Swiss-Prot record:
InterPro entries: AHI1_SH3 (IPR035832), Cilium-Associated_Jouberin (IPR052803), SH3-like_dom_sf (IPR036028), SH3_domain (IPR001452), WD40/YVTN_repeat-like_dom_sf (IPR015943), WD40_repeat_dom_sf (IPR036322), WD40_rpt (IPR001680). This is Jouberin. It comes from Rattus norvegicus (Rat). It is found in: Cytoplasm, Cytoskeleton, Cilium basal body; Cytoplasm, Cytoskeleton, Microtubule organizing center, Centrosome, Centriole; Cell junction, Adherens junction. Residues 1-17, 77-86, 116-132, 173-185, 964-1003, 1012-1040 have a biased composition (Basic and acidic residues). Gene3D superfamilies: SH3 Domains, YVTN repeat-like/Quinoprotein amine dehydrogenase. The gene is Ahi1.
Length: 1047
């Protein structure tokens, strides 16, 4: 080591005095200037300030140099010099000869350190200085004046890297800091509350080796002086394990979890694991003689199978049956005195020696570092070392994962009992002990929510489906954003954001809670169904259920949360066993009864029966009884009970199925704009019309009491019916949705409902029933009871109990309602008026769907005209009846269009044959007459053949009737001539069509089947079906709403 002479120290002191000399001269000049005149006072003041600054600099330099004596005693310097000289003898590269100098006193060492820092600042950035050279803190370096330039030295250029503890000039063992932070001196880390944490990030791609399948990292904490593991600061303190024995007085090594290439489908190891050593962190960073000089060694290992150990004798001698892949090292304190902590470091990996010379009582990896040549491995390891503050309370676990975590076990029956009870402890909530008092009493009939509660964020693209948990405390929403498709959990009733569950790569079609609300299952078009744990800190996927195609539905079995049933695009129903004690989900059975893709699955409350619906209108009923003690054996005995194939919706996709709360009826939502509730005993169904649904997947729902039916629509309106009578009792027509309302969920314990839509920036809306709003309405109706209509009354929409609170106010018009006499003629007249009103409503709905139904149509722009203001026409006697019997009576809110003639849909004639290539397309033949419902774009139109067949067809394959008549003979020859019946159908006046519509609807309302007219034949039935579809598609004219009640 190069030593400094007293002459050199004196020269350094003269350099320091050199700056103070101009200050003395300036003081004499200042005194002379003061005698000359007051005009030179300013110059004298400046000189005085410069003198004081020079004195401060001298004091600061002396203080910094004295501090170095405490950190670099002469014995340590001599010891390091000897070690460095031994290693320099082994180097093959040439170095510039440095003349030897005699030993110096401690003061000489301080001056030498000061001059070394001046040379260091003058050197270019990234250069490597001699090993063993003393360095001071960076603050002292910045304060040392540079009056003289150091002599240039010839140095070999090296790759740009930050060498913190490099012991050789050739760069072996370079530790590169990827996150450039300012160096940390151990002096700054004197907080005794910190423990050492080593974060293992990842490696670069490892060398291709088929024998490496699940690598892991083993971390050793070794003392450089002794070659042994570092002694504990407190021998009784557990450092690596919670159950360390008292006789273990050193720090045991710790290993990370293995990274399974096959399971994680990646050959780039990314552990991202925090390893905690419960040792005093400042103790490992001190530089005193009695403190250890710590080196961290990292071994990348892979465990061997028993067959490999038995068949290969070379493996039998290796430690613990591990295959050693590579190793790296890191000094906590570098050669420059700075600590390699609080930043991400990149460590060079080395091959382990082929024939290691293992000695007893010596750490093997330390022998590799100190005595064996280092052969670089073509990869690096990324780590971060930092001090961690231990939390005050660490929750015990069944298996301790760190030295601070207690291991506590409980009997199996206690664990199952606690997990199955969801009343006392509500899962996934931080304030689970806080009880929420719901307003709806047990057994009380549900009310129609009439007040807007709040809106929730659903991402940039809206929400596709949502569902309340069984305890009512969490709302799960399957949303879509620019970056992915997260499941967002909101706390109810506060609406507070809880967490996001990220993992799906495409639209989430369905979600379902387990019976105890501890698990959530979702199905997506990315080909997977995922099971999530409902825990406070759990945001990753618990189990993944892979499928060959889109997964449309997924449900937990009500009897056990270990069974998950999924419906897929490949027409298969799969039953999975999801057990927390096993690593992966098990596919128990596949059911292949359906001939088309399965859209919906549901269970009854006991789980004895399962119902599945597909795309061609077939509903299968299954016997699904399960024994909790033997789940897999019970699934093998599942059988199909019967298949429901109704002619009314044959070939129509089933969008959603739900069992009525009484367990004897089934809600069937199909894509023909009709909802049905079927009695499962006699298979008789009641229809509910009004909601438009021809293309989108929409979910409807029944309230927990079974007295209300909610359904969304493609026109952005929510419809409410009474399932017992089939009457439409309410309608949310002013919701701020621009897209189809996809899903509705009613709260299990509160008169609360949630709506969602899948579209650009569509929110999640929550409405709640407010008794005060209903009471204000009742008082208003009593005041105007029996009077003539008062068109000038304007009230807030909150005043109507069945209408939600909206951002705009609507006008309410009170009409007189005269009690009718009990004569049959008067009743028939009212029924006819009622039917005419509903007929006009359906036509108005169809017109609106013509404009907004297409999924490929662009969103409404800013130039689009706003929806016309709607008003309510309240009938007095009917509303009084509603409030007189609130449990049984329901309000019917309907829309009445302005009385104007409705043009019939245009008719076109097919010029060429076309075969449908998708399920939503229409197969046409030459000469077919097609009724056009709407034009999706210039190339594709939507229409019906009049045979109950509807779908899209190419616009260039058809021509209008007038163009067909005027077309040249060559074109007509390519198409067959129209039959007399088809010509009569085309020439039939609109008035007769209207009468057919009215008769057809009258028959359906009275519950009777349409009468077959033999004289009109088959073509007339086709005509009636076509007009019915036309009525259900029209809904665009400006409308008013009328509140009526038919007893």
């Amino acid at each position: 080591m190069e030593q400094e002479t007293p002459e050199k120290v004196d020269s350094a002191q003269e350099k320091v005095r050199g700056k103070s000399q101009p200050a003395d001269d300036s003081e004499d000049s200042r005194e002379k200037a003061g005698t000359e005149g007051t005009g030179e006072l300013t110059e004298a003041y400046e000189l005085q300030v410069a003198e004081e600054m020079a004195k401060e600099i001298k004091k600061k330099i002396r203080r910094k140099l004295k501090e170095q004596l405490t950190y670099f005693p002469p014995d340590t310097l001599l010891h390091d010099d000897k070690l460095g000289s031994e290693k320099r003898k082994k180097k093959k590269k040439k170095k510039v000869p440095v003349p030897a100098k005699p030993e110096t006193s401690p003061s000489d060492v301080c001056d030498s350190a000061a001059e070394g820092e001046q040379k260091k600042e003058g050197a270019p950035e990234g250069s490597h200085h001699r090993e063993g050279g003393c360095s001071t803190e960076q603050n002292a370096d910045a304060s040392v004046p540079e009056n003289t330039k150091p002599k240039p030295k010839k140095m070999k250029k090296k790759p740009k890297a930050v060498s913190e503890d490099n012991e050789e000039t050739n760069g072996d063992g370079v530790h590169e800091i990827t996150g450039r932070d300012s160096p940390v001196h151990p002096k700054c880390l004197l907080d005794d509350d910190l423990v050492m944490g080593v974060y293992i990030h990842r490696t670069d791609r490892l060398k291709s080796d088929f024998m490496i399948s699940h690598p892991m990292v083993k971390i050793h904490v070794v003392d450089e002086h002794t070659g042994q593991y570092v002694k504990k600061d407190d021998s009784e303190r557990p450092v690596s394990s919670y159950y360390e024995k008292d006789n273990v007085d050193y720090i045991l090594p710790i290993m990370t979890q293995p990274y399974d290439f096959k399971k994680l489908k990646s050959r780039l190891p990314e552990w991202e694991e925090q390893v905690i050593f419960n040792e005093n962190f400042p103790y490992l960073l001190r530089e005193f003689d009695e403190c250890p000089k710590v080196i961290l060694f990292f071994e990348i290992l892979d465990f061997l199978s028993m067959d490999e150990i038995k068949n290969n004798s070379e493996f039998q001698n290796q430690e613990c049956g591990f295959r050693k892949i590579a190793w790296a090292f890191l000094k906590l304190l570098g050669a420059n005195g700075n600590a390699n902590i609080n930043s991400k470091l990149r460590l060079q990996l080395y091959y382990p020696p082929t024939k290691p010379r293992s000695q007893p009582n010596v750490v093997e990896v330390f022998e590799w570092w100190s005595k064996c040549p280092r052969n670089r491995y073509p990869s690096t390891l990324y780590v971060t070392v930092r001090g961690l503050k231990v939390p005050d309370c660490i929750k015990p676990s069944y298996r301790s994962m760190m030295a601070l975590q207690e291991e506590r076990g409980t009997p199996v029956y206690c664990e199952r009992h606690r997990e199955t009870s969801s009343v006392d402890t509500e899962p996934g909530l931080e304030d689970s002990k806080e009880e929420v008092k719901w307003k709806r009493l047990p057994g009380q009939a549900c009310r129609i929510p009439n007040k807007h509660l709040f809106s929730l964020n659903a991402g940039e693209r809206g929400c596709f489906c949502l569902d309340f948990s069984h305890n009512g405390r969490i709302l799960a929403a399957a949303c879509a954003s620019r970056d992915g498709y997260p499941i967002i959990l909101y706390e109810i009733p506060s609406g507070r954001f809880m967490r996001e569950l990220c993992g799906h790569l495409n639209i989430i079609y369905d979600l379902d809670w387990s019976k105890d609300d501890r698990y959530l299952v979702t199905s997506s078009s990315d080909g997977t169904a995922r099971v999530w744990k409902n825990e406070i800190n759990s945001t990753s996927t618990f189990r993944v259920l892979p499928h060959p195609s889109f997964v449309y539905t997924a449900r937990f079995h009500p009897a056990t949360r270990e069974l998950v049933v999924t419906g897929c695009y490949d027409s298969m129903i799969r039953i999975w066993k999801v057990d927390a004690r096993e690593d992966a989900a098990i596919l128990v059975r596949q059911l292949d009864v359906h001939k088309s893709f399965v859209n919906s699955i549901c269970f009854d409350d006991e789980g004895h029966h399962m119902y599945s619906g597909d795309c061609i209108g077939v509903i299968a009923v299954w016997d699904t009884y399960v024994k909790v003690t033997d789940v897999q054996h019970s699934v093998r005995h599942w059988t199909i009970n019967k298949e429901i194939k109704e002619t009314e919706f044959r070939g129509v996709p089933v969008s959603y199925l739900e069992v009525h709360p009484n367990g004897k009826r089934l809600l069937i939502h199909t894509k023909d704009s009709t909802l049905r509730i079927m009695d499962l005993r006699i298979l008789a169904a009641r229809k509910f019309v009004g909601a438009a649904n021809y293309r989108e997947k929409i979910h409807s729902t029944l309230t927990p009491c079974g007295t209300l039916l909610f359904s969304g629509s493609e026109d952005g309106i929510v419809y409410v019916w009474n399932p017992e009578t089939g009457e439409q009792v309410a309608m949310y027509s002013e919701l701020p949705f621009k897209s189809t309302i996809r899903d509705i969920s009613y709260h299990p314990f509160e008169n609360m409902v949630a709506f969602c839509a899948f579209g650009q920036s569509e929110p999640i809306l929550l409405y709640i029933y407010d008794f005060q709003v209903a009471q204000q309405e009742a008082e208003m109706l009593k005041r105007y009871s029996g009077t003539v209509p008062l068109p000038g009354i304007h009230l807030s929409e909150d005043a109507l109990c069945t209408c939600p609170k909206l951002p705009q106010q609507g006008s309410f018009q009170i009409d007189e309602f005269v009690n009718t006499e009990n004569n049959s003629s008067r009743k028939i007249q009212l029924v006819k008026q009622r039917l005419e009103t509903v007929t006009e409503v359906i036509r108005s709905c169809a017109a609106k769907v013509n404009k907004n139904l297409s999924i490929t149509s662009p969103p409404p722009g800013p130039a689009k005209k706003p929806r016309v203001k709607q008003s309510f026409v309240l009938t007095t006697d009917q509303i009084i009846h509603q409030f007189g019997v609130p449990q049984t009576a329901f309000i019917s809110i309907e829309r009445r269009p302005f009385m104007r003639p409705v043009d019939p849909p245009p008719m076109v004639v097919a010029l060429y044959d076309y075969t449908a290539s998708r399920s939503d397309e229409l197969t046409i033949h030459r000469g077919d007459i097609i009724r056009v419902f709407f034009k999706d774009n210039e190339d594709w139109w939507y229409g019906s053949l009049g045979k109950g067949q509807e779908g899209f067809f190419p616009a260039n394959h058809v021509a209008s009737e007038t163009l067909y008549r005027d077309s040249p003979p060559k074109v007509k020859e390519r198409s067959p001539p129209l039959t007399p019946k088809e010509k009569a159908k085309m020439e039939k006046p609109p008035a007769s069509r209207k009468s057919l519509i009215k008769d057809r609807f009258l028959d359906s309302r009275l519950g009777s089947k349409p009468m077959g007219h033999s004289e009109k034949g088959r073509d007339q039935n086709f005509e009636e079906r076509g007009h019915k579809s036309d009525m259900e598609m029209k809904k665009s004219e400006p409308t008013v709403r009328k509140v009526t009640l038919i007893e």
